[in-house]
């Protein structure tokens, strides 16, 4: 399923002001943050996680961080909608890579009794948004969760998992901390995110400098996501795709907002600097190839939404192979008989 929504830059989506953390919230430093450079042996070391922490902290310390929250607010509200669709209560929930708390603010205490929010950026946790739900903020890495097995009824994550080096491990950790019959509801950027910016930078850099370097971080393909969830132990999987299109005055405004979101590139093989004339050429290419009728330029954010359950005996299961009492061939004969009777 694919949905497409068009947003305007800097227009508040939900009209909710950013306020100080609730008096019931507290911040703890957890042992879940690994030593620098530690990953599992199978992980590809694609992203500079320390740089990503600094980027997110810088964004959270800006005088008006809400100015750049529009995309994460929107996706956070969509995850909350999916939680409400499940129509059950969750006494204890966990938000992984919570940022400033973009999911919890859209949930209510009738649905979620208490929520733990984790992030690698301490300033994002310090400046988290207010919620009615009792909240505990914990500094922790997505790949190294400091919780015991079978702890949470619900785990959510919004626009964070695309920055982990070891996504299979992160999903296994989520499955590990869920209780049996617990559910994971998440969202991450997909492979077509910012394709307009990627193409414009590549064309301009090739023309001006005789080659190009990656300036947009790599993303997981949607056909890999279901496999990774299944391998992590989840069942009854749902994976669907949204596209959110945001219109900007120009390419430089888009890049400014990405920085304000804490979503700048942090891959190890990124190019440290682009020449000014290359950037100007990329902006011209972007406008020429993609501009809207009103002169603005679109930026596409592809969102992969995922839902997976941890196994429990009470869950519905497919029948064993060969247990059917009627074959598809017999059903086809029945259809022929009914068609003949109608004549």
Swiss-Prot record:
Its main location: mitochondrion. InterPro entries: Malonyl-ACP_OMT, Methyltransf_11, SAM-dependent_MTases_sf. SUPFAM superfamilies: S-adenosyl-L-methionine-dependent methyltransferases. GO terms for cellular component: matrix side of mitochondrial inner membrane; mitochondrion. Its EC number is 1.-.-.-, 2.1.1.-. Keywords: Membrane, Methyltransferase, Mitochondrion, Mitochondrion inner membrane, Oxidoreductase, Transferase, Transit peptide. One of its GO terms (molecular function) is S-adenosylmethionine-dependent methyltransferase activity. Residues 1-29 form a transit peptide. Pfam families: Methyltransf_11. It is found in: Mitochondrion inner membrane. It comes from the Eukaryota. The keyword Transport does not apply. GO terms for biological process: methylation; mitochondrial respiratory chain complex I assembly. PANTHER family: ARGININE-HYDROXYLASE NDUFAF5, MITOCHONDRIAL. Belongs to the methyltransferase superfamily. Arginine hydroxylase that mediates hydroxylation of 'Arg-122' of NDUFS7 and is involved in the assembly of mitochondrial NADH:ubiquinone oxidoreductase complex (complex I, MT-ND1) at early stages. May also have methyltransferase activity. Interacts with NDUFAF8, leading to stabilize NDUFAF5. Interacts with NDUFS7. Interacts with PYURF (via TRM112 domain); the interaction is direct and stabilizes NDUFAF5 protein. This is Arginine-hydroxylase NDUFAF5, mitochondrial. The gene is Ndufaf5.
């Amino acid at each position: 399923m694919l949905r497409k929504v068009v947003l305007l830059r800097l227009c508040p989506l939900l009209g909710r002001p950013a306020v100080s953390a609730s008096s019931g919230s507290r911040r703890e430093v957890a042992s879940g943050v690994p030593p620098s450079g530690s990953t599992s042996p199978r992980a590809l070391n694609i992203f500079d996680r320390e740089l990503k922490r600094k980027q997110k902290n810088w964004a959270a310390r800006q005088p008006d961080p809400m100015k750049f929250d529009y995309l994460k607010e929107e996706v956070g509200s969509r995850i909350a909608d999916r939680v409400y669709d499940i129509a059950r209560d969750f006494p204890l929930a966990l938000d992984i890579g919570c940022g400033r708390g973009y999911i919890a603010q859209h949930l209510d205490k009738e649905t979620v009794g208490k929520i733990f929010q984790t992030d690698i950026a301490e300033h994002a946790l310090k400046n988290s948004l207010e919620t009615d739900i009792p909240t505990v903020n914990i500094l922790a890495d997505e790949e190294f969760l400091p919780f015991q097995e079978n702890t949470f009824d619900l785990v959510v994550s919004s626009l964070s998992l695309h920055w982990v080096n070891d996504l299979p491990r992160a999903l296994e950790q989520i499955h590990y901390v869920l209780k049996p019959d617990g559910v994971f509801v998440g969202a991450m950027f997909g492979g077509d995110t910012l394709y307009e910016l990627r193409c414009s930078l590549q064309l301009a850099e090739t023309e001006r400098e005789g080659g190009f370097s990656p300036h947009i971080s790599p993303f997981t393909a949607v056909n890999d996501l279901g496999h990774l969830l299944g391998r992590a132990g989840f069942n009854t999987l749902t994976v669907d795709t949204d596209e959110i299109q945001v219109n900007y005055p120009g390419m430089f405004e888009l890049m400014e907002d990405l920085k304000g979101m804490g979503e700048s590139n942090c891959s190890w093989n990124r190019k440290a600097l682009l020449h000014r004339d290359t950037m100007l050429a990329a902006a011209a290419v972007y406008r020429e190839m993609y501009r809207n009728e009103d002169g603005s330029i679109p930026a596409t954010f592809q969102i992969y939404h995922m839902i997976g359950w941890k196994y429990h005996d009470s869950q519905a299961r497919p029948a064993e192979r060969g247990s059917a009492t009627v074959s598809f061939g017999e059903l086809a004969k029945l259809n022929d008989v009914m068609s003949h009777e109608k004549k």
